[in-house]
Curated annotation (Swiss-Prot):
GO terms for biological process: DNA-templated transcription; positive regulation of transcription elongation by RNA polymerase II; positive regulation of viral transcription; symbiont-mediated perturbation of host chromatin organization; symbiont-mediated suppression of host innate immune response; symbiont-mediated suppression of host translation initiation; symbiont-mediated suppression of host type I interferon-mediated signaling pathway. HIV-1 lineages are divided in three main groups, M (for Major), O (for Outlier), and N (for New, or Non-M, Non-O). The vast majority of strains found worldwide belong to the group M. Group O seems to be endemic to and largely confined to Cameroon and neighboring countries in West Central Africa, where these viruses represent a small minority of HIV-1 strains. The group N is represented by a limited number of isolates from Cameroonian persons. The group M is further subdivided in 9 clades or subtypes (A to D, F to H, J and K). It is found in: Host nucleus, Host nucleolus; Host cytoplasm; Secreted. The keyword Metal-binding applies. The modification Asymmetric dimethylarginine is found at residue 52. Transcriptional activator that increases RNA Pol II processivity, thereby increasing the level of full-length viral transcripts. Recognizes a hairpin structure at the 5'-LTR of the nascent viral mRNAs referred to as the transactivation responsive RNA element (TAR) and recruits the cyclin T1-CDK9 complex (P-TEFb complex) that will in turn hyperphosphorylate the RNA polymerase II to allow efficient elongation. The CDK9 component of P-TEFb and other Tat-activated kinases hyperphosphorylate the C-terminus of RNA Pol II that becomes stabilized and much more processive. Extracellular circulating Tat can be endocytosed by surrounding uninfected cells via the binding to several surface receptors such as CD26, CXCR4, heparan sulfate proteoglycans (HSPG) or LDLR. Neurons are rarely infected, but they internalize Tat via their LDLR. Through its interaction with nuclear HATs, Tat is potentially able to control the acetylation-dependent cellular gene expression. Modulates the expression of many cellular genes involved in cell survival, proliferation or in coding for cytokines or cytokine receptors. Tat plays a role in T-cell and neurons apoptosis. The record marks 11 as: Essential for Tat translocation through the endosomal membrane. The lineage of its organism: Viruses, Riboviria, Pararnavirae, Artverviricota, Revtraviricetes. This is Protein Tat. Residues 73-82 have a biased composition (Polar residues). The gene is tat. It comes from Simian immunodeficiency virus (isolate EK505). One of its GO terms (molecular function) is metal ion binding. It comes from the Viruses. Interacts with host CCNT1. Associates with the P-TEFb complex composed at least of Tat, P-TEFb (CDK9 and CCNT1), TAR RNA, RNA Pol II. Recruits the HATs CREBBP, TAF1/TFIID, EP300, PCAF and GCN5L2. Interacts with host KAT5/Tip60; this interaction targets the latter to degradation. Interacts with the host deacetylase SIRT1. Interacts with host capping enzyme RNGTT; this interaction stimulates RNGTT. Binds to host KDR, and to the host integrins ITGAV/ITGB3 and ITGA5/ITGB1. Interacts with host KPNB1/importin beta-1 without previous binding to KPNA1/importin alpha-1. Interacts with EIF2AK2.
Length: 93
């Protein structure tokens, strides 16, 4: 084992940093690449801000998940009494 220079910071000691850069691969070799990769990829620990979970929204295409109501004439929607009386007269005769 080589003697370490006491004036050198611990993160600059020889062998403290890997020779290759970290990547996004999650294979077994890359998970054990360095301590950071092990905690991030191997253990799945992230110390960043947590994203707020969003509510599930209805898709834009299906807003109500229901069939649209058939269009009715204005007189039937408002309950026009004259139209109903005429219909009753035709039914009676």
């Amino acid at each position: 084992m080589e003697p370490v220079d006491p004036e050198l910071e611990p993160w600059n000691h020889p062998g403290s940093q890997p020779k290759t850069a970290c990547n996004n691969c999650h294979c077994k070799v890359c998970c054990y690449h360095c301590v950071y990769c092990f905690t991030k990829k191997g253990l799945g620990i992230s110390y960043g801000r947590k994203k707020r979970s969003q509510r599930r929204r209805t898709p834009q295409s299906n807003k109500s998940h229901q069939d649209p109501l058939p269009k009715q004439p204005l007189s039937q929607r408002l309950g026009d009494q004259t139209g109903q009386k005429e219909q009753k007269k035709t039914l009676e005769s």
